[in-house]
Amino acid sequence: MGFGDLKSAAGLRVLNDFLADKSYIEGYVPSQADIAVFEAVGAPPPADLFHALRWYNHIKSYEKEKASLPGVKKALGKYGPADVEDTTGSGATDSKDDDDIDLFGSDDEEESEEAKRLREERLAQYESKKAKKPALVAKSSILLDVKPWDDETDMAKLEECVRSIQADGLVWGSSKLVPVGYGIKKLQIQCVVEDDKVGTDMLEEQITAFEDYVQSMDVAAFNKI
C-alpha cells in the first residue's frame, strides 16, 4: 500500500485519484491517518489536483487539534491504494531529475529493459484511464461554527457580515443560533463550495476579518457531495 513518492507529481496524482470519492484517508472523520499523509505531502498540491488540494486545505484547518484527532499514526505504507508502494522519503528520487517518474518505486539502480517497459506500460495505462474520466465539478457541504466575542454581540449583524462574503463557487445555506453557555450563542451556518475554487482557509480568513463581531470560526462538519 502507499501513494508512491508524495514529494513527486506522480505520487500526488495517485493521492488525488484516491481522494476522488473520499473525504478522508481512512473512515469518515479526520484522523491520524490524514495527519500522517498531510505531513508527508508538506505543501499544497497543484490546483489541477483539486481532490488532493481540497483534502489538504481541510486537514490544514485542524492544525491546532491534530494531536487530539482519533487513531494511531502509522507508516505511510499502511495507507492508500493496495497496488502502489510507498517510496516517500526513501531517497529513490534524490539522484534522479525531477522529471523522472517512478510510480511503482523500483529499488534497482539499473532497471532491466523488461522492467522498464512494464513500468512505462503501467504508467501509460494509468494516465490513459485518468484522462478518460469525465471532468466533474467536485463540491463539498460545509457546516461552520462562527463564535462571537460575548453575549452582547449583535448576532443578526454577524450573520449579515458572513453572508456578505461572495465568491465564485460559494453558496450559503440555512443557519441557526446555538447556545454555547453564559448567554452566548454561536452562529451555525451551512454552505456548499466548489472544491477547486473555495477552501476553508479562505472562508476563515474572510469571516474572521469581521473582528468587531467574530471571535473565531471552526469547521463543524465537512462532507463531499
Curated annotation (Swiss-Prot):
It comes from the Eukaryota. GO terms for cellular component: cytosol; eukaryotic translation elongation factor 1 complex. Residues 80-114 are annotated as: Disordered. One of its GO terms (molecular function) is guanyl-nucleotide exchange factor activity. Residues 2-84 form the GST C-terminal domain. The keyword Ion transport does not apply. Residues 96-113 have a biased composition (Acidic residues). Belongs to the EF-1-beta/EF-1-delta family. Catalytic subunit of the guanine nucleotide exchange factor (GEF) (eEF1B subcomplex) of the eukaryotic elongation factor 1 complex (eEF1). Stimulates the exchange of GDP for GTP on elongation factor 1A (eEF1A), probably by displacing GDP from the nucleotide binding pocket in eEF1A. This is Elongation factor 1-beta. It comes from Gallus gallus. The lineage of its organism: Eukaryota, Metazoa, Chordata, Craniata, Vertebrata. The gene is EEF1B.
